[in-house]
């Protein structure tokens, strides 16, 4: 029995030592959210030397922080349940996997945990002041503002903006992940995240009709799926708590996908989501000279391109799949018809490679009008990227349940990849599509010169 008690004592001591050695993000109970919490900001440092074991740091104790390297601050937002952000560990590890840097998790869970949103939002400037004091000390030790990068989620995006404002916009970069909308919509630039808060500000808007901010806030603002309902998220309250937070959190998971090598999400500068869906805004992907902006960590590769704009701001749109890694692969389908009468309808296109892999895109955001000898360019999105397309199938539908079945006579169809403009363009001539009947054919290389 004595041996058992000694074992339990040693186990408790080892757990206590582990907790002291490796501090973790503050975990609070739902009771804390009910009664509210006072503000306490903790800074936890991760580097490649301590990837899984954080160091608590402050203005007088830097730990492993190397001021000559980039320092990325991760600032979370409102925490109505008191639990740690489920994505935090993945974000820390993802950042350190792509670059040798300092990653500082800004834990203000004591302050953000409350059922009353206004209580949390009222503390954002105080959090920003704590961060400024720490960065001031970093600068005194030889750090450069050029190397300061802040990633702010929801309320954390505005906190990052407040920090940047206190340095007159000389922070290297701020990324806002679905910046909070409530209490910030319509506010003047000094009371929210703004393009002038850093040398480069990129923003992902994923929940503009609820918890997020709709209007542009950065040098480049990304709107996945138009910034509204995200694929794979619950559409009704029957989805439980995910119904409220899934769209809002999607911005974080989209950013995470940019840290992985599985695929790269490309966006298309455009005035509106509808124009993008109609294929009017994909010129950046038609040549290797003018690349499209990339979502997430590598978005700043487009910084020099934006400097040529006045003002240096743009909106970019793209569609995603329902699950990680969320990538969609874009193609232009150019169709010239020779029907005597005008036809209106939808086109469904399938691609198949030599291995038998298939991928499908139904281009049905709005019916397309086909006129004789007029070229129509359709933007098709696929879940898979098939390198060598061996077969293509097309199906035309007017959507009518009654009346005659029409034919769509195609003089020429051309398929070109936007993700890989260097790939050969594929063509087919003299096709007749019977309504609601799938027509399969083998494409040939287009004789035209490549763009």
Curated annotation (Swiss-Prot):
Catalytic function, reaction form: 1-hexadecanoyl-2-(9Z-octadecenoyl)-sn-glycero-3-phosphate + H2O = 2-(9Z-octadecenoyl)-sn-glycero-3-phosphate + hexadecanoate + H(+)
Molecular function as annotated in GO: carboxylic ester hydrolase activity; heparin binding; phospholipase activity
Sugar attachment sites are: 50, 66, 357
Which EC number(s) are documented for this chain? Answer: 3.1.1.-
Phenotype when changing residue 154 to A = Loss of lipase activity
Q: Which InterPro entries did the record assign?
A: AB_hydrolase_fold (IPR029058), Lipase (IPR013818), Lipase_LIPH (IPR016272), Lipase_N (IPR033906), TAG_lipase (IPR000734)
Residues at the active site: 154, 178, 248
Q: What is this protein called?
A: Lipase member H
Organism of origin:
Homo sapiens (Human)
Q: What is the lineage of its organism?
A: Eukaryota, Metazoa, Chordata, Craniata, Vertebrata
């Amino acid at each position: 029995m004595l041996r058992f008690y000694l074992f339990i004592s040693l186990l408790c001591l080892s757990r206590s030592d582990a907790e002291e050695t490796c501090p973790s993000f503050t975990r609070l109970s739902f009771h804390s959210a009910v009664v509210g919490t006072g503000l306490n900001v903790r800074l936890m440092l991760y580097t490649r030397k301590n990837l899984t074991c954080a160091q608590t740091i402050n203005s007088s104790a830097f730990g492993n922080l190397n001021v000559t390297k980039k320092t990325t601050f991760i600032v979370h937002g409102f925490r109505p349940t008191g639990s740690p952000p489920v994505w935090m560990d993945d974000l820390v590890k993802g950042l350190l996997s792509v670059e040798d840097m300092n990653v500082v998790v800004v834990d203000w869970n004591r302050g953000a945990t409350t059922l009353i949103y206004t209580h949390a939002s009222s503390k954002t400037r105080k959090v920003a002041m704590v961060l400024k004091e720490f960065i001031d000390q970093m600068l005194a030790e030889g750090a450069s503002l050029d190397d300061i990068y802040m990633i702010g989620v929801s309320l954390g995006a505005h906190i990052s903006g407040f920090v940047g404002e206190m340095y007159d916009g000389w922070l290297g970069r701020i990324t806002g992940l679905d910046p909070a909308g409530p209490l910030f919509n319509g506010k003047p630039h000094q009371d929210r995240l703004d393009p002038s808060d850093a040398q480069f500000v990129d923003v992902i808007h994923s929940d503009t009709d609820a918890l997020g901010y709709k209007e542009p806030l950065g040098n480049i603002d990304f709107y996945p799926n138009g910034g509204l309902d995200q694929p794979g998220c619950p559409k009704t309250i029957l989805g439980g708590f995910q119904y409220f937070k899934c769209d809002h959190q999607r911005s974080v998971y989209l950013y995470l996908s940019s840290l992985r090598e599985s695929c790269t999400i490309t966006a298309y500068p455009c005035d509106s989501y509808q124009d993008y869906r109609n294929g009017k805004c994909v010129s950046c992907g038609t040549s290797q000279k003018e690349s499209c902006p990339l979502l997430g960590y590598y978005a700043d590769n487009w910084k020099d391109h934006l400097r040529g704009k006045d003002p240096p701001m743009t909106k970019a749109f793209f569609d995603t799949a329902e699950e990680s890694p969320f990538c969609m692969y874009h193609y232009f389908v150019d169709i010239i018809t020779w029907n005597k009468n005008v036809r209106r309808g939808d086109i469904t296109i399938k691609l198949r490679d030599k291995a038998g892999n298939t991928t499908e895109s139904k281009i049905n955001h709005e019916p397309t009008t086909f006129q004789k000898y007029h070229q129509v360019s359709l933007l098709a999105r696929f879940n898979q990227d098939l390198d060598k397309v061996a077969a293509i199938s097309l199906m035309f539908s007017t959507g009518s349940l009654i009346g005659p079945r029409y034919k769509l006579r195609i003089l020429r169809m051309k398929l070109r990849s936007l993700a890989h403009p260097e790939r050969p363009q594929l063509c087919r001539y003299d096709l007749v599509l019977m309504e609601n009947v799938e027509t399969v054919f083998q494409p040939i290389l287009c004789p035209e010169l490549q763009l």
